[in-house]
Amino acid sequence: VINDNTEINRVYSFFNAIRGNNTPNEYQRVLAVLKKVMEIQECAQNELDYDELYELMLSVATDFDIPNPFPEKDRFIDVYRTLQGFEKLSWTDVLEYGDVKSKFRVPESVVDEMEKNFIEGFQEVLIPEAEKFSPFLERLVDTHYDSHFTLTTMDAFYYRVLTEMFDGNEMVDIKQTNIYQYEFTSEKYDLILSVPVFGIRDKVCENSEFICRDYDMIAVENLALHLKSEGILSIVLPARITFAGGNVRELREFLQSMYCLKEISDLPSGIFDNTGVKTLLFTITTGRTDEVTIKKFVFENEDARKTGNKKLLVQDDTFVLEDELSDMGDWNVNRIFESQDEDWIKFQESNVKKQELGAVASIFRGKAVNRKDLNGSIGVVNISNIGEYEIDYSNLDHFEEENRKIANYILQTGDLLIPARGTAIRIAIFEEQSYPCIASSNVIVIRATDESLSTTYLKLFFDSPLGRKMLVTRQQGTAVMNISYKELNNIEIPLPSIEEQRSIAEEYTRELKVYKKAIQEAENRWNSTLAKLQARI
């Protein structure tokens, strides 16, 4: 890919020359046709005249399965003349040209991590949907020149461009095939690098032969089938593979029974452009390993999203025995780190009574409200109403509904409210108002069902470093917070005597009042001082 600034400016001029009446989606294809025409002209024994070049262009466009990009011959001749003065572009430049937002590309930092799975000597390597790796394909092939690469794509145009890119290289095969279909190839490979489609709602047809119907889940199952003995699959998957139930749980169990997990790496949010889906990099092998390496990556640069510098640093790493991972029932990276956290270990080794939250409380999501009514008799507590210490009742939404439809959602004094999604975890205790209230569907309600639990004490615990870590580990796979209310049932909380809880809760409530009073007095004094000073101006 061209890096020199002077050449980049020339390239932009090159691109501008081909635009004309073509749409942005056509630029890349037009550029490919022109590049191929220029290559053929360079290799021709005799220089072709403009009529011959135009006929050649039509032939190349047909080969690329592209409609005639230059219906007007004169327009083609003008563009061709313009391009003759420019240096040759690579096929990588052709692949990378176009609307960045419309392309999905694997960042170099992720490619670098995947590349660590190469070994010295010959390997059969498969890179499906290779256009996603296009900026780095030539580098990978050149660096690992003694390995044989199979690059696949589902797109006919990309198939042709990749074929041109590696024309004459006997160590590279290009195939047009679909990795989301059974038996997409009969070959097996030593190493497979893949970033499948994820974050879309479309699923394959119900009569699919795979465990799951999601494209990303199909990819990991299907690609793993094509590993040789001691083969390795390095694949990026959305975080839901680590926690989801149903067919996804069945897929996890299948992968652990048939293969070995070698490494699970948590990737930072924003590593891939144009998606908010939380992702992890998995290393799966047909070889044997007793330990699974667990890593958590962060960006080297805090402003990575703005600067585009997405270099990765290992923030934390550990390992877990494969049998222990199987016993966990999921692949929750945060929970693995939590179990090895000093605060967690101290808690587990303490003599304090411990109890699963679901045994002493009912946990449920609020109700979706579609129609607001300023004069409605029922209040709705939204995420925005939940403060760090209390609920802002003055700005509640209201609506009207039949009692029977909301009876199970009416909030009671002492209910603990937690945002189910958003950017921050804030916890507050509800107090009954003069009108009935419910929580919105984005709010989780925890209600004590046993006299052994004080929800004020529970709030204080969840606000503690250990309690906050427990909540974070129940977060599901998106870039923004998304806590599963069902997962909260399994949280193990410290449960001292109710007398001790009440003592802690009473002191908390008393000191909170003192704190709020002091804050209010300080604000009043400050506002008064400002008013006096401004009056003297």
Positions of the model-derived regions?
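Long recognition/docking surfaces used for binding and targeting
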Residues: 26-101
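Conserved S-adenosyl-L-methionine
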Residues: 97-194, 199-201, 238-239
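Conserved Class I SAM-dependent methyltransferase catalytic core
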Residues: 212-277, 281-283
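Flexible, glycine-/basic-rich loop-and-beta segments that form/coincide
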Residues: 274-353
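A short glycine-rich beta-alpha junction/loop motif
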Residues: 282, 436-444, 476-502
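Non-catalytic DNA-recognition/assembly elements of restriction-modification systems
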Residues: 319-373, 497-537
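Sequence-specific dsDNA recognition surfaces
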Residues: 355-369, 384-413
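A short beta-sheet element
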Residues: 407-409, 413-462
